[in-house]
Amino acid sequence: DLVTAELKDSVHPRQRAAMAMAKSDDLINWKLLPATSQPDQGFAETEVFQYEVVDGVPILLFCTAGPNISDERQAEGELGGVYSLPVREDLEDINFEHATLFPRKNIYASRLIQDVDGGWNLIAFINYVDGKFVGELCDPIPVTADPILGLVPKA
């Protein structure tokens, strides 16, 4: 399983987020493995991880809220949401600096699902609309993966 981690040796306190893996043979006793990413990659927190191979591209999906992104990302207009990045299949050397924000910016806590025809769709909770919390699931969004951009809406 993929787990949220925080690395204390970060130069920037708001960029301590990391990802690690935990393994279990019995789902009762777990062994935490070393982090697969480094600190200082733009996020204070990353959560709701999912790894899938989407249309041949290994993708890591996660989300974070606006207060948990770096000043640099905030200066570029990012407010948090669903992020993705192409990764190695062994999930080693994750670099969150390459993460891109999914174009639909009002969703959070997403999951990739396949439809009956094998196409990929993103479902997520609708976060805020016009300043009001919604908290409902959005309709499935057809997606594909780009080896540079990560997860993108299907054209």
Label each region the model flagged:
Residues D1-A155:
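Carbohydrate-active catalytic/glycan-binding domains of CAZyme proteins
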